[in-house]
Design a protein with these regions (language model features):
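Alpha/propeptide regions of enzymes that mature by internal proteolysis
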Residues: 1-185
């Protein structure tokens, strides 16, 4: 889900049942929630969703919106008293992208809920969802995915939201480093 007025977004990954996940956190100032639970030595083996969002620390509220939706479905880690939806989140900085940021109520909880309600097997990549407000120096950042299948039972997928520092171009040119490695689109 994206909000073009604030130029920010949220992307949600979930399944009908809990699933295993891992994470790689990069960058000089990561904003995350519950990503430590993805280490193999933790008691929680499965999660209920993943959130990628903009908004710097404000964006952490997107996972609260997703947790609300999952709780409505009676999903989560069973503590014996209540089920707690496990929703690791990674957030990008997009507060300087020109969008409206003078809101009085944090919009990210609603963005998270909207993204959860729009979950489907097919989704867009690029400057949508987690890529809506992302930038990479002088060009747009975005959302990308990859997946592998091993037989009928094992499926491995990766999703990344790119909002990096530095230039994606050869110094003094408009030629992208990636031009050396892929097709031109």
């Amino acid at each position: 889900a994206q909000d073009y007025h604030i130029k920010s977004w949220a992307t949600v990954l979930t399944r009908l049942t809990s699933f295993r996940a891992s994470v790689s956190i990069l960058g000089g100032s990561p904003v995350t929630k519950e990503t430590d639970l993805l280490s193999p030595d933790k008691i929680v083996e499965n999660i209920d969703g993943i959130v990628l969002a903009g908004g710097s620390a404000f964006g952490l509220d997107a996972s609260s919106g997703v947790m609300d939706c999952l709780r409505d479905q009676n999903r989560g880690f069973d503590t014996g008293a209540i089920k707690v939806p496990i929703v690791p989140s990674a957030i990008l900085f997009d507060l300087k992208n020109g969008g409206f940021k003078e809101w009085s109520i944090n919009p990210y909880r609603e963005l998270g809920q909207n993204a959860f309600l729009k979950v489907s097997h097919d989704f867009e990549i690029g400057s949508v969802g987690a890529g809506c407000g992302a930038t990479t120096s002088i060009v747009k950042g975005g959302l990308g995915t990859s997946s592998l299948f091993y037989g009928d039972r094992i499926k491995v997928g990766a999703i990344v939201a790119v909002n990096s520092v530095g230039s994606p171009c050869f110094p003094g040119t408009n030629f992208l480093f990636s031009d050396l490695y892929g097709e031109k689109n």
